[in-house]
Amino acid sequence: MIPPADSLLKYDTPVLVSRNTEKRSPKARPLKVTVQQPGPSGAGPQPPKAKLPSTSCVPDPTKQAEEILNAILPPREWVEDTQLWIQQVSSTPSTRMDVVHLQEQLDLKLQQRQARETGICPVRRELYSQCFDELIREVTINCAERGLLLLRVRDEIRMTIAAYQTLYESSVAFGMRKALQAEQGKSDMERKITELETEKRDLERQVNEQKAKCEATEKRESERRQVEEKKHNEEIQFLKRTNQQLKAQLEGIIAPKK
């Protein structure tokens, strides 16, 4: 028989239900908790119990408490070597010493499994869930109504934690998507900046080339203008001298006739 998993929730001794169960794996599978709802016909695997002849129509309080316990805290079952074992939650009332022992076991397991005292800790959550289930078991044995009310509180807490976990996972996924988008946008911007810097260098090179061409053209035109001005000045001087010579010749021709 596989030893039952160590839990703060108190269970009865495991009971062999069937020896002809189909072998599902080479080795015994881990403990599995199965939800079983009590029905009027007592459906579902139940450990063999000694049945006494009914002497009254009033339901047996012990049996009713066991059914409520099995509904609140379902039995766990497992298979080993084609044998089906089942283990129900204990219906034995707890004493004050049992509660003190439960507290000591909780503190010991928290220390042994190195649970964190603050923050999110799956180990601490698991142990406190087991402790809460054990408290529900103890309360249910004494008062089924209080046990059912605590069950509603437990289920509400689990639902709230599951909602927060879903919200956290969604937030993490959203943050990852945004981070990837930002990283992609950063890569695009870096690539665009590189392209613009390359384009800027090309434009600066073209500007420098155009400036050099402009300076060369201005220098060439300045030299050409100086040459043209010099040529024009020489022509003017030549024409002035020619004019003076012609004027002198004309005056020399006209003067003897007077």
UniProtKB/Swiss-Prot annotation:
Molecular function in Gene Ontology: dynein heavy chain binding
InterPro entries: Axonemal_dynein_light_chain (IPR019347)
Subcellular location: Cell projection, Cilium; Cell projection, Cilium, Flagellum; Dynein axonemal particle; Cytoplasm
Region listing for Disordered, in residue ranges: 1-60, 202-231
Coiled-coil zones: 176-255
Gene Ontology biological-process entries: sperm flagellum assembly
Keyword terms: Cell projection, Cilium, Coiled coil, Cytoplasm, Dynein, Flagellum, Motor protein
One GO CC annotation: dynein complex
Chief location category: other
Family the entry assigns: Belongs to the inner dynein arm light chain family.
Biological function: Involved in sperm flagellum assembly.
Subunit structure, interactors included: Interacts with CFAP45. Interacts with DYNC1H1.
Name of the protein: Axonemal dynein light intermediate polypeptide 1
Organism: Rattus norvegicus
Gene this chain is encoded by: Dnali1
